[in-house]
Amino acid sequence: MAAPYNPPKKNEDFIFRIALTDISATGSFKANPTIASGDWKVDKDGGGLNDLATLPTVDPAGSIWLKITLSSTEMNADVVAVQGIDQTSPKEWADFAQTILTTT
């Protein structure tokens, strides 16, 4: 399958979808989670965290699915690490971390 799906390729945009755990309802996914600037960061090959260029979106609207889009610049690494940490207090959703190993 061609970009932006699998396999994740170095220097090519990449899209993946996740569901976040609802912090107030253990064992449940959070429907329509609130996503704010600064919640989502990316690290390339251990070089340091930066905000994602494109804020993740709930897609389809009102669902549990969060669409994460990484640009070709953000995918310019052998190891890409994405983290999501809700900055609100109390937290709405549980922290998230994902490592992506790219191919050439």
Q: What feature does the model see in each segment?
A:
Residues M1-T104:
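Polar, enzyme-active/binding microenvironments
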